[in-house]
Structure formats: structure tokens, C-alpha cells
């Protein structure tokens, strides 16, 4: 598949999830997303209204993080926060699973949580992304989560919050994609800091990339394509 520079830009969820992010930081994030035509800004739930207003009239989404970054909230509170974020302008949701229940092998809980979160999103025509936080999981746990997701069908499964002990890994993206196939998309996030990282994740099967280095990556890809005298890059999927 051939990707133009704008195609690459539309894979990027431009991210600022820091606790000390200011209103000026949020405005900068949105301005950059508009300038480079990124797909989404990824922000903490409380910033949903401000960012959605900044992005009004554009095709750039406001993505709210729910139960972030630990996932340690009840299903009811996650659903409430999801609906609240959507009410305040969020039109994509990224939530963190309850890792404690996964470790306890309470797969019914994980499935119920995923289903209720998908329902809360889809009743408002909003995509739902499920964050696994792979750095804390075994390969078998990643596989089990992906199998549950294949059944429940959120819009995306996602590698990481970026706040754990490590971020996205190529082998994890490949594993997740091998299980869900084309039925559920895969988002890679965490530690993706340059164009080589970015391209490696896309080649591995990532359909979306969450990163705070979106501008740097965009500019590096632009330079690479200019130097190679091409207007697109071929990536085998």
C-alpha cells in the first residue's frame, strides 16, 4: 500500500496527556493538529470541551482518555466518564482495561467492561479504543484480550498508555493484528519518537499511531520523501 504524507498524518493521534498541561499547551496541540492535518488530538477527559471547541469546523477528532492511565475504576464510572466526555465534545474514546481483573483471569468481567464501553461509545457513533497496557501483560494475556476484542468488536485495540514501564513493541503489534485481523484495528502508542519507529509500527500492522512527537515525525517523513524524490512510500501490510 502506498502512503502519501497526508496519509501518514491521518494515522497520527497527536498527544498531550501530561498532568501539568496548560490551556496554552492544549491550544498548541490543537493548532499543530490543524496545521499538519493529524487525525486526532489525544487528551485527558477534562480537556474535551476546550479541545473540541478549538477543533470545531475541522475533520480532526477530539479523543478523550478514560480511566487513564491505570484503568482502576469500576465499569459504571468508566461508562459515566465516557458519556460525560462525549457530551463535552469528545468524538473518540481511549479507555484502559482493568488489569487487576485480567490478572485474576476474570475474563467475564473484562468482556462485560469492554461491551459496556463499546455500547456507550457506539450509541453516540463514537469510536472506542481499548488500551491493553502490554508492558504489564504476558503474551498469553495479550492474546486473550485480543480474542475477547475480536468477539466484542471495539473499533481499536491499543498497545499502551505511554505511562507504563514501556511502550509499543513491534512484536506486540504483530501479535495483536494476527488475532483481530481486519475486524478490529490496532493502535500503537508509547515510545514512538521518530520516523523509523513510526514506519516500523505501520509495517507491523498499526492502523493508528499515538505519539507526542507527531510534528517531528511528520517533518522527518517530509524530508525523507523529498530526498528520495517520491510523493509516497510503499509499505507492505
Swiss-Prot record:
Keywords associated with the record: Cytoplasm, Lyase, Schiff base
Any one of the GO BP annotations: carbohydrate catabolic process
Transmembrane segments: none
Gene Ontology MF: a single term: deoxyribose-phosphate aldolase activity
EC identifiers of the protein: 4.1.2.4
Cellular component GO terms, alphabetical: cytoplasm
Enzyme class: lyase
Pathway: Carbohydrate degradation; 2-deoxy-D-ribose 1-phosphate degradation; D-glyceraldehyde 3-phosphate and acetaldehyde from 2-deoxy-alpha-D-ribose 1-phosphate: step 2/2
The UniProt record lists the keyword rRNA processing: no
Localization (cell): Cytoplasm
Database matches in Pfam families: DeoC
Reaction equations catalysed: 2-deoxy-D-ribose 5-phosphate = D-glyceraldehyde 3-phosphate + acetaldehyde
Domain of life of the native organism: Bacteria
InterPro entries, per the entry: Aldolase_TIM, DeoC, DeoC/FbaB/LacD_aldolase, DeoC_typeI
Residues at the active site: 94, 158, 187
CDD domains reported in the protein's UniProt record: DeoC (cd00959)
Annotated family: Belongs to the DeoC/FbaB aldolase family. DeoC type 1 subfamily.
Record function comment: Catalyzes a reversible aldol reaction between acetaldehyde and D-glyceraldehyde 3-phosphate to generate 2-deoxy-D-ribose 5-phosphate.
Protein name as catalogued: Deoxyribose-phosphate aldolase
Provenance organism: Lactobacillus acidophilus (strain ATCC 700396 / NCK56 / N2 / NCFM)
